[in-house]
Protein backbone atom coordinates (compact mmCIF):
# COMPACT_ATOMS: atom_id res chain seq x y z
CA UNK A 1 0.00 0.00 0.00
CA UNK A 2 1.27 3.43 -0.93
CA UNK A 3 1.40 5.57 2.22
CA UNK A 4 2.91 8.63 0.53
CA UNK A 5 -0.19 10.83 0.84
CA UNK A 6 -0.41 14.47 -0.03
CA UNK A 7 -1.18 17.05 2.65
CA UNK A 8 -4.82 17.19 1.57
CA UNK A 9 -5.11 13.40 1.69
CA UNK A 10 -3.55 13.29 5.16
CA UNK A 11 -6.01 15.86 6.44
CA UNK A 12 -8.91 13.94 4.92
CA UNK A 13 -7.62 10.72 6.49
CA UNK A 14 -7.29 12.41 9.89
CA UNK A 15 -10.87 13.71 9.65
CA UNK A 16 -12.17 10.27 8.60
CA UNK A 17 -10.28 8.64 11.48
CA UNK A 18 -11.78 11.11 13.96
CA UNK A 19 -15.27 10.52 12.55
CA UNK A 20 -14.75 6.75 12.79
CA UNK A 21 -13.66 7.01 16.44
CA UNK A 22 -16.60 9.25 17.33
CA UNK A 23 -19.03 6.94 15.55
CA UNK A 24 -17.50 3.95 17.36
CA UNK A 25 -18.00 5.70 20.71
CA UNK A 26 -21.61 6.50 19.78
CA UNK A 27 -22.16 2.97 18.48
CA UNK A 28 -20.97 1.42 21.76
CA UNK A 29 -22.51 4.04 24.06
CA UNK A 30 -24.96 1.58 25.66
CA UNK A 31 -22.05 -0.63 26.74
CA UNK A 32 -19.78 2.16 27.96
CA UNK A 33 -20.14 1.31 31.65
CA UNK A 34 -19.69 -2.41 30.93
CA UNK A 35 -16.47 -1.75 28.99
CA UNK A 36 -15.16 0.55 31.74
CA UNK A 37 -15.89 -2.04 34.45
CA UNK A 38 -14.16 -4.75 32.41
CA UNK A 39 -11.16 -2.44 31.86
CA UNK A 40 -10.96 -1.68 35.59
CA UNK A 41 -11.10 -5.38 36.42
CA UNK A 42 -8.47 -6.23 33.82
CA UNK A 43 -6.17 -3.51 35.15
CA UNK A 44 -6.54 -4.61 38.77
CA UNK A 45 -5.96 -8.29 38.01
CA UNK A 46 -3.04 -7.75 35.59
CA UNK A 47 -0.42 -8.60 38.29
CA UNK A 48 -2.18 -11.91 38.92
CA UNK A 49 -2.34 -12.58 35.17
CA UNK A 50 1.40 -11.94 34.87
CA UNK A 51 1.99 -14.36 37.73
CA UNK A 52 -0.01 -17.05 35.93
CA UNK A 53 1.74 -16.43 32.59
CA UNK A 54 5.07 -17.33 34.19
CA UNK A 55 3.69 -20.81 34.85
CA UNK A 56 1.04 -21.47 32.16
CA UNK A 57 0.23 -20.46 28.61
CA UNK A 58 -1.76 -17.32 27.81
CA UNK A 59 -5.19 -18.95 27.44
CA UNK A 60 -4.97 -20.93 30.66
CA UNK A 61 -3.59 -17.90 32.49
CA UNK A 62 -6.53 -15.76 31.33
CA UNK A 63 -9.00 -18.45 32.42
CA UNK A 64 -7.37 -18.77 35.86
CA UNK A 65 -7.36 -14.99 36.27
CA UNK A 66 -11.04 -14.77 35.33
CA UNK A 67 -12.00 -17.50 37.81
CA UNK A 68 -9.90 -15.85 40.52
CA UNK A 69 -11.57 -12.49 39.87
CA UNK A 70 -15.04 -14.01 40.07
CA UNK A 71 -14.13 -15.87 43.25
CA UNK A 72 -12.65 -12.74 44.82
CA UNK A 73 -15.82 -10.71 44.16
CA UNK A 74 -18.79 -13.09 43.94
CA UNK A 75 -18.00 -15.39 46.87
CA UNK A 76 -17.53 -12.72 49.60
CA UNK A 77 -20.44 -10.59 48.37
CA UNK A 78 -22.70 -13.63 48.02
CA UNK A 79 -21.80 -14.89 51.49
CA UNK A 80 -22.41 -11.48 53.06
CA UNK A 81 -25.76 -11.05 51.29
CA UNK A 82 -26.77 -14.60 52.29
CA UNK A 83 -25.98 -13.95 55.94
CA UNK A 84 -27.89 -10.66 55.77
CA UNK A 85 -30.93 -12.47 54.33
CA UNK A 86 -30.77 -15.02 57.16
CA UNK A 87 -30.68 -12.22 59.72
CA UNK A 88 -33.61 -10.47 58.04
CA UNK A 89 -35.62 -13.71 58.24
CA UNK A 90 -34.81 -14.01 61.95
CA UNK A 91 -35.81 -10.40 62.56
CA UNK A 92 -39.11 -10.99 60.76
CA UNK A 93 -39.76 -14.04 62.97
CA UNK A 94 -38.97 -12.06 66.12
CA UNK A 95 -41.31 -9.27 65.01
CA UNK A 96 -44.03 -11.84 64.33
CA UNK A 97 -43.57 -13.32 67.82
CA UNK A 98 -43.72 -9.84 69.32
CA UNK A 99 -46.95 -9.11 67.43
CA UNK A 100 -48.53 -12.34 68.70
CA UNK A 101 -47.69 -11.57 72.33
CA UNK A 102 -48.58 -7.84 72.27
CA UNK A 103 -51.98 -6.21 72.64
CA UNK A 104 -51.98 -4.18 69.44
CA UNK A 105 -55.11 -2.20 70.32
CA UNK A 106 -53.55 -0.88 73.52
CA UNK A 107 -50.26 -0.25 71.72
CA UNK A 108 -52.07 1.59 68.92
CA UNK A 109 -53.91 3.81 71.39
CA UNK A 110 -50.62 4.69 73.10
CA UNK A 111 -49.00 5.52 69.75
CA UNK A 112 -51.93 7.72 68.72
CA UNK A 113 -51.84 9.54 72.05
CA UNK A 114 -48.09 10.06 71.74
CA UNK A 115 -48.29 11.38 68.14
CA UNK A 116 -51.23 13.68 68.88
CA UNK A 117 -49.41 14.97 71.96
CA UNK A 118 -46.41 15.87 69.80
CA UNK A 119 -48.63 17.65 67.26
CA UNK A 120 -50.32 19.64 70.04
CA UNK A 121 -46.96 21.04 71.12
CA UNK A 122 -46.23 22.41 67.63
CA UNK A 123 -47.65 25.94 67.23
CA UNK A 124 -50.00 26.71 64.33
CA UNK A 125 -50.37 23.00 63.59
CA UNK A 126 -53.88 21.68 64.12
CA UNK A 127 -53.73 18.02 63.12
CA UNK A 128 -55.35 15.09 64.88
CA UNK A 129 -54.45 11.55 63.87
CA UNK A 130 -57.32 9.10 64.18
CA UNK A 131 -57.40 5.34 63.91
CA UNK A 132 -59.30 5.52 60.59
CA UNK A 133 -56.78 7.94 59.08
CA UNK A 134 -53.92 5.73 60.24
CA UNK A 135 -55.64 2.66 58.78
CA UNK A 136 -56.14 4.37 55.41
CA UNK A 137 -52.51 5.50 55.37
CA UNK A 138 -51.30 1.96 56.11
CA UNK A 139 -53.51 0.56 53.32
CA UNK A 140 -52.16 3.15 50.87
CA UNK A 141 -48.55 2.40 51.85
CA UNK A 142 -49.14 -1.35 51.53
CA UNK A 143 -50.65 -0.89 48.06
CA UNK A 144 -47.77 1.29 46.90
CA UNK A 145 -45.19 -1.16 48.25
CA UNK A 146 -47.00 -4.05 46.59
CA UNK A 147 -47.09 -2.26 43.24
CA UNK A 148 -43.40 -1.39 43.55
CA UNK A 149 -42.48 -5.01 44.30
CA UNK A 150 -44.61 -6.19 41.37
CA UNK A 151 -42.89 -3.80 38.96
CA UNK A 152 -39.49 -4.73 40.38
CA UNK A 153 -40.07 -8.46 39.92
CA UNK A 154 -41.47 -7.90 36.43
CA UNK A 155 -38.45 -5.81 35.41
CA UNK A 156 -36.06 -8.34 36.99
CA UNK A 157 -37.66 -11.22 35.08
CA UNK A 158 -37.66 -9.22 31.86
CA UNK A 159 -34.02 -8.19 32.21
CA UNK A 160 -32.74 -11.71 32.90
CA UNK A 161 -31.76 -12.17 29.25
CA UNK A 162 -30.03 -8.79 29.32
CA UNK A 163 -28.08 -9.75 32.43
CA UNK A 164 -26.88 -12.98 30.81
CA UNK A 165 -25.90 -11.11 27.64
CA UNK A 166 -24.02 -8.47 29.64
CA UNK A 167 -22.20 -11.16 31.60
CA UNK A 168 -21.05 -12.88 28.40
CA UNK A 169 -19.90 -9.57 26.90
CA UNK A 170 -18.09 -8.70 30.13
CA UNK A 171 -16.16 -11.98 30.08
CA UNK A 172 -15.05 -11.49 26.47
CA UNK A 173 -14.04 -7.85 27.00
CA UNK A 174 -12.26 -8.66 30.27
CA UNK A 175 -10.19 -11.44 28.69
CA UNK A 176 -9.45 -9.38 25.55
CA UNK A 177 -8.21 -6.41 27.57
CA UNK A 178 -6.21 -8.69 29.83
CA UNK A 179 -4.42 -10.47 26.99
CA UNK A 180 -3.97 -7.50 24.63
CA UNK A 181 -3.24 -4.78 27.18
CA UNK A 182 0.22 -3.91 25.76
CA UNK A 183 -1.10 -3.72 22.19
CA UNK A 184 -3.92 -1.48 23.35
CA UNK A 185 -1.52 0.76 25.27
CA UNK A 186 0.69 1.10 22.18
CA UNK A 187 -2.32 1.82 19.96
CA UNK A 188 -3.59 4.58 22.27
CA UNK A 189 -0.12 6.14 22.32
CA UNK A 190 0.09 6.07 18.52
CA UNK A 191 -3.38 7.57 18.06
CA UNK A 192 -2.90 10.31 20.62
CA UNK A 193 -1.65 13.45 18.80
CA UNK A 194 -0.03 14.68 22.03
CA UNK A 195 2.58 11.91 21.91
CA UNK A 196 3.33 8.74 23.81
CA UNK A 197 4.85 10.51 26.83
CA UNK A 198 1.63 12.40 27.53
CA UNK A 199 -0.33 9.20 26.88
CA UNK A 200 1.75 7.41 29.49
CA UNK A 201 1.04 10.28 31.90
CA UNK A 202 -2.71 9.98 31.33
CA UNK A 203 -2.69 6.20 31.67
CA UNK A 204 -0.54 6.37 34.79
CA UNK A 205 -2.90 8.90 36.40
CA UNK A 206 -5.95 6.84 35.45
CA UNK A 207 -4.39 3.65 36.82
CA UNK A 208 -3.44 5.35 40.07
CA UNK A 209 -6.95 6.73 40.47
CA UNK A 210 -8.51 3.31 39.79
CA UNK A 211 -6.26 1.65 42.35
CA UNK A 212 -6.82 4.49 44.77
CA UNK A 213 -10.59 4.33 44.37
CA UNK A 214 -10.86 0.56 44.68
CA UNK A 215 -8.21 0.06 47.35
CA UNK A 216 -9.00 3.29 49.13
CA UNK A 217 -12.73 3.81 48.84
CA UNK A 218 -13.90 0.18 48.93
CA UNK A 219 -11.39 -1.29 51.37
CA UNK A 220 -11.63 1.67 53.74
CA UNK A 221 -15.42 1.66 53.43
CA UNK A 222 -15.54 -2.06 54.26
CA UNK A 223 -13.37 -1.50 57.34
CA UNK A 224 -15.52 1.42 58.46
CA UNK A 225 -18.75 -0.49 57.86
CA UNK A 226 -17.62 -3.53 59.82
CA UNK A 227 -16.28 -1.31 62.63
CA UNK A 228 -19.57 0.60 62.85
CA UNK A 229 -21.65 -2.59 62.84
CA UNK A 230 -19.39 -4.09 65.52
CA UNK A 231 -19.89 -1.04 67.75
CA UNK A 232 -23.68 -1.39 67.47
CA UNK A 233 -23.43 -5.11 68.28
CA UNK A 234 -21.17 -4.51 71.29
CA UNK A 235 -23.47 -1.74 72.53
CA UNK A 236 -26.26 -4.27 72.99
CA UNK A 237 -28.19 -4.39 69.70
CA UNK A 238 -27.57 -7.97 68.58
CA UNK A 239 -29.95 -8.04 65.61
CA UNK A 240 -28.77 -7.43 62.06
CA UNK A 241 -24.98 -7.24 62.35
CA UNK A 242 -24.46 -8.13 58.69
CA UNK A 243 -27.31 -5.85 57.62
CA UNK A 244 -25.64 -2.94 59.38
CA UNK A 245 -22.28 -3.96 57.91
CA UNK A 246 -23.68 -3.83 54.36
CA UNK A 247 -25.57 -0.56 54.89
CA UNK A 248 -22.70 1.20 56.64
CA UNK A 249 -20.20 -0.01 54.03
CA UNK A 250 -22.40 1.31 51.22
CA UNK A 251 -22.74 4.65 52.99
CA UNK A 252 -19.01 4.84 53.71
CA UNK A 253 -18.23 4.48 49.98
CA UNK A 254 -20.03 7.78 49.48
CA UNK A 255 -18.04 10.57 51.16
CA UNK A 256 -20.92 11.28 53.58
CA UNK A 257 -19.95 8.23 55.62
CA UNK A 258 -21.91 5.88 57.85
CA UNK A 259 -22.22 8.50 60.57
CA UNK A 260 -25.64 9.46 59.22
CA UNK A 261 -26.81 6.10 60.60
CA UNK A 262 -24.60 5.38 63.61
CA UNK A 263 -24.87 8.83 65.23
CA UNK A 264 -28.72 8.95 65.23
CA UNK A 265 -28.74 5.27 66.26
CA UNK A 266 -26.49 6.02 69.24
CA UNK A 267 -28.63 9.01 70.24
CA UNK A 268 -31.73 6.83 69.99
CA UNK A 269 -30.14 4.21 72.24
CA UNK A 270 -29.48 6.92 74.84
CA UNK A 271 -33.10 8.11 74.73
CA UNK A 272 -34.39 4.54 75.06
CA UNK A 273 -32.40 3.93 78.23
CA UNK A 274 -29.20 2.29 76.97
CA UNK A 275 -27.07 5.28 77.92
CA UNK A 276 -23.74 3.43 78.10
CA UNK A 277 -24.33 1.68 74.77
CA UNK A 278 -25.35 4.90 73.01
CA UNK A 279 -22.34 6.81 74.32
CA UNK A 280 -20.09 3.92 73.25
CA UNK A 281 -21.50 3.98 69.69
CA UNK A 282 -21.01 7.76 69.43
CA UNK A 283 -17.47 7.74 70.84
CA UNK A 284 -16.50 4.71 68.72
CA UNK A 285 -17.62 6.47 65.57
CA UNK A 286 -15.89 9.75 66.44
CA UNK A 287 -12.62 8.25 67.68
CA UNK A 288 -12.20 5.00 65.71
CA UNK A 289 -14.35 4.88 62.57
CA UNK A 290 -13.50 8.39 61.39
CA UNK A 291 -9.77 7.80 61.91
CA UNK A 292 -9.72 4.59 59.86
CA UNK A 293 -9.69 6.76 56.74
CA UNK A 294 -6.82 8.89 58.07
CA UNK A 295 -4.72 5.80 58.85
CA UNK A 296 -5.38 3.65 55.77
CA UNK A 297 -5.66 6.27 53.00
CA UNK A 298 -1.94 7.24 52.97
CA UNK A 299 -1.10 3.53 52.77
CA UNK A 300 -3.62 2.41 50.15
CA UNK A 301 -4.05 5.47 47.91
CA UNK A 302 -1.10 6.52 45.68
CA UNK A 303 0.03 10.11 46.05
CA UNK A 304 -0.65 10.98 42.40
CA UNK A 305 -4.26 9.76 42.74
CA UNK A 306 -5.24 12.11 45.56
CA UNK A 307 -7.68 14.81 44.61
CA UNK A 308 -8.84 17.75 46.62
CA UNK A 309 -11.64 16.70 48.98
CA UNK A 310 -14.14 19.02 47.28
CA UNK A 311 -13.23 17.71 43.80
CA UNK A 312 -13.44 14.12 45.05
CA UNK A 313 -16.88 14.72 46.54
CA UNK A 314 -18.15 16.45 43.40
CA UNK A 315 -16.72 13.78 41.09
CA UNK A 316 -18.28 10.93 43.07
CA UNK A 317 -21.78 12.44 43.13
CA UNK A 318 -21.56 13.63 39.53
CA UNK A 319 -20.43 10.14 38.51
CA UNK A 320 -23.29 8.51 40.41
CA UNK A 321 -25.75 10.91 38.75
CA UNK A 322 -24.43 10.16 35.26
CA UNK A 323 -23.41 6.49 35.44
CA UNK A 324 -25.26 5.07 38.44
CA UNK A 325 -23.41 3.09 41.14
CA UNK A 326 -20.36 2.59 38.91
CA UNK A 327 -19.95 6.36 38.89
CA UNK A 328 -18.15 5.96 42.22
CA UNK A 329 -15.18 4.75 40.14
CA UNK A 330 -15.82 6.46 36.80
CA UNK A 331 -16.41 9.92 38.30
CA UNK A 332 -12.99 10.29 39.99
CA UNK A 333 -11.25 8.85 36.90
CA UNK A 334 -12.87 11.48 34.68
CA UNK A 335 -11.97 14.18 37.20
CA UNK A 336 -8.31 13.11 37.26
CA UNK A 337 -8.32 13.28 33.43
CA UNK A 338 -9.60 16.87 33.61
CA UNK A 339 -7.01 17.82 36.22
CA UNK A 340 -4.22 16.13 34.21
CA UNK A 341 -5.27 17.98 31.04
CA UNK A 342 -5.04 21.29 32.90
CA UNK A 343 -1.60 20.31 34.26
CA UNK A 344 -0.36 19.47 30.75
CA UNK A 345 -1.70 22.79 29.41
CA UNK A 346 0.05 24.74 32.17
CA UNK A 347 3.28 22.83 31.52
CA UNK A 348 3.24 23.50 27.76
CA UNK A 349 1.93 27.06 27.62
CA UNK A 350 2.90 28.53 31.00
CA UNK A 351 6.10 26.64 31.77
CA UNK A 352 4.78 25.13 35.00
CA UNK A 353 6.80 22.08 35.97
CA UNK A 354 4.84 18.90 35.40
CA UNK A 355 4.61 16.46 38.28
CA UNK A 356 6.86 13.47 37.69
CA UNK A 357 5.91 9.84 38.06
CA UNK A 358 6.32 8.23 41.44
CA UNK A 359 8.92 5.52 41.59
CA UNK A 360 7.23 2.18 42.22
CA UNK A 361 7.85 0.77 45.68
CA UNK A 362 10.59 -1.81 46.00
CA UNK A 363 9.12 -5.25 46.39
CA UNK A 364 11.04 -7.37 48.84
CA UNK A 365 11.18 -11.08 48.26
CA UNK A 366 11.30 -12.88 51.58
CA UNK A 367 12.11 -16.16 49.85
CA UNK A 368 14.15 -15.19 46.77
CA UNK A 369 14.50 -17.76 44.05
CA UNK A 370 17.93 -18.94 43.05
CA UNK A 371 18.67 -20.21 39.63
CA UNK A 372 20.61 -23.42 39.09
CA UNK A 373 23.81 -21.49 38.39
CA UNK A 374 23.53 -19.23 41.43
CA UNK A 375 25.41 -20.18 44.53
CA UNK A 376 25.46 -18.62 47.96
CA UNK A 377 29.26 -18.41 47.93
CA UNK A 378 29.57 -17.27 44.33
CA UNK A 379 31.50 -13.99 43.97
CA UNK A 380 29.66 -10.95 42.61
CA UNK A 381 30.23 -10.11 38.94
CA UNK A 382 33.15 -7.79 38.34
CA UNK A 383 32.89 -4.39 36.73
CA UNK A 384 34.94 -5.53 33.77
CA UNK A 385 32.44 -8.25 33.03
From Swiss-Prot:
Transmembrane feature ranges: 7-27, 32-52, 66-86, 159-179, 218-238, 241-261, 263-283, 319-339
Predominant localisation class: membrane
Locations listed in the record: Cell membrane
Gene Ontology CC: one annotated term: plasma membrane
Topology term for the membrane: Multi-pass membrane protein
Listed Pfam families: AI-2E_transport
Assigned keywords, A-Z: Cell membrane, Membrane, Transmembrane, Transmembrane helix, Transport
Family: Belongs to the autoinducer-2 exporter (AI-2E) (TC 2.A.86) family.
Name assigned to this protein: Putative transport protein MT1133
Organism: Mycobacterium tuberculosis (strain CDC 1551 / Oshkosh)
Lineage: Bacteria, Bacillati, Actinomycetota, Actinomycetes, Mycobacteriales
